[in-house]
Amino acid sequence: MITKRKKKSYTSVYALGQYISMSAHKARRVIDQIRGRSYEEALMILELMPYRGCYPIFKLVYSAAANASHNKGFKETNLVISKAEVNQGNTVKKLKPRARGRSYPIKRSTCHITIVLEDISFYQQYEEYLMYLKKPGCSNENRNLTCYDTYSSGGLWDKK
């Protein structure tokens, strides 16, 4: 069996909630609203939405931000929800006793939720550095790279 080794990411932090007693469809309805938004905006959205699934997702987003600030020293204002996924978990099966000695099955569905936060300040610093390199006054030795085109150089296309 081939297993992939996870690459260590320097800009992302995640929080994983397993066996949350809610169906995956109901959790996805909430997750789709916050995917791609900033951390603070996602917290405001989750506080104001009227769904029962908002509270465990709110706790997960808050936990992921706490992981980011404690483990990697990121600021909460620079965090963005880059990836949020909901997977179906186990189904807890019970029996409900009914009249005349009968019983009805009850299925409680669970789900696993993963929230990944990324620090966008790293990308902003990288873009600023690229803009600095593109300035005309910048003395960079590798800046005068030329792109050779096979059509204009007449290399292979002259011969038939």
UniProtKB/Swiss-Prot annotation:
It comes from Crucihimalaya wallichii (Rock-cress). This protein binds specifically to 23S rRNA. Keywords: Chloroplast, Plastid, Ribonucleoprotein, Ribosomal protein, RNA-binding, rRNA-binding. GO terms for biological process: translation. Part of the 50S ribosomal subunit. GO terms for molecular function: rRNA binding; structural constituent of ribosome. SUPFAM superfamilies: Ribosomal protein L22. Belongs to the universal ribosomal protein uL22 family. This is Large ribosomal subunit protein uL22c. It is found in: Plastid, Chloroplast. One of its GO terms (cellular component) is chloroplast. InterPro entries: Ribosomal_uL22 (IPR001063), Ribosomal_uL22_bac/chlpt-type (IPR005727), Ribosomal_uL22_bac/org-type (IPR047867), Ribosomal_uL22_CS (IPR018260), Ribosomal_uL22_sf (IPR036394). PROSITE patterns: RIBOSOMAL_L22.
